[in-house]
């Protein structure tokens, strides 16, 4: 994990053009190494204390405090959901450093409703109430703990090396990425009007497809956009010997699941990456 953190910070710092000369590269390496223990401890804490989408209160507080220490102007609790009763936990941190482009660096913050069984000494044991009763485990199973750690490491490097770059950096802590509502909430609250409009936006995502210590990059969109829909099928059952007397929602819903798969196979250009997934059926 130390290697992944170091590689992520180094890659973002390099993209932000603070490490071009060899001497600067060596200095950057040394600075990252000095921060490694602190960043690893932060990673373990974030992994052990995950929060679900729209519930990222402690996570956003940690990010905001660390960014303030690095010299950023921080706005927290940023965002506006359309659903009543939801608090916004977006974080926006600005570091102005003379003339030049405005560059956004973004991380996601939320975890997933999954019970962790990794056996790690810093494994999550967090459980929260499930809608409808019972409890559900919470785990950083998609790497957002790593993303946030790299994000904070990059912020520290930019704050320490202001003599090597010019412009404005805006760091974005995005809530509710897993439920795809957090970005819209931040835009709705005026992200591009209250803060410098970006000339460039940078983000990263961990992947097991690339060996540790290496970085894969792509200009433009790389991973899929996402949207979601809930479908409710209403009906009623009946006696198994008299199926004509019922309107069976399970049968109808099963037909819907199969029909949805034809959207990709028959409605979409096969050269475009598209997927339709039914993630829950109950």
Where are these regions (language model features)?
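Histidine/acidic-residue-rich, glycine-tolerant segments that coordinate divalent metal ions
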Residues: 90, 127-139, 145-146, 158, ...
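Bacterial N-terminal signal peptides
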Residues: 8-20
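N-terminal secretory signal peptides that target proteins for export/translocation
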Residues: 1-5
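Residue-level recognition of conserved structural "scaffold" positions that shape functional pockets
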Residues: 15, 97, 150, 188-189, ...
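Acidic/His- and Gly-rich active-site-bordering loop/insert found
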Residues: 25-140, 149-166
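A generic alpha-helix preference that emphasizes hydrophobic side chains
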Residues: 18-22, 29, 43, 183, ...
């Amino acid at each position: 994990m130390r290697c992944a953190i170091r590689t992520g910070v180094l890659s973002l710092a390099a993209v932000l053009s603070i490490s071009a000369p060899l001497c600067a590269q060596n200095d950057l390496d040394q600075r990252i190494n000095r921060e490694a223990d602190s960043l690893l401890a932060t990673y373990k804490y974030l992994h052990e204390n995950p929060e679900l989408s729209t519930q990222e209160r402690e996570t956003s507080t940690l990010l905001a405090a660390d960014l303030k220490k690095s010299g950023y102007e921080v706005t927290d609790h940023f965002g506006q959901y359309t659903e009543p009763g939801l608090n916004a936990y977006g974080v926006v941190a600005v570091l102005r450093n003379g003339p030049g482009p405005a560059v956004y660096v973004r991380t996601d913050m939320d975890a997933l409703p999954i019970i962790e069984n990794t056996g790690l000494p810093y494994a999550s044991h967090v459980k929260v109430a499930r809608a409808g009763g019972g409890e559900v485990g919470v785990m950083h199973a998609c790497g957002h703990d790593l993303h946030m750690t790299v994000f904070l490491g990059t912020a520290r490097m930019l704050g320490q090396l202001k003599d090597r770059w010019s412009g404005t950096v805006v760091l974005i802590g995005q809530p509710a990425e897993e439920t795809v509502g957090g970005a819209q909430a931040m835009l709705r609250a005026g992200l591009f009007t209250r803060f410098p409009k970006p000339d460039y936006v940078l983000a990263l995502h961990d992947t097991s497809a690339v060996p540790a210590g290496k970085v894969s990059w792509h200009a433009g969109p790389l991973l899929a956009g996402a949207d979601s829909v809930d479908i409710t099928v209403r009906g009623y059952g009946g006696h198994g010997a008299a199926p004509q007397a019922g309107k069976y929602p399970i049968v109808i819903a099963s037909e819907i699941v199969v029909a949805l798969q034809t959207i990709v196979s028959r409605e979409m250009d096969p050269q475009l990456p598209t997927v339709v997934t039914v993630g829950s059926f109950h």
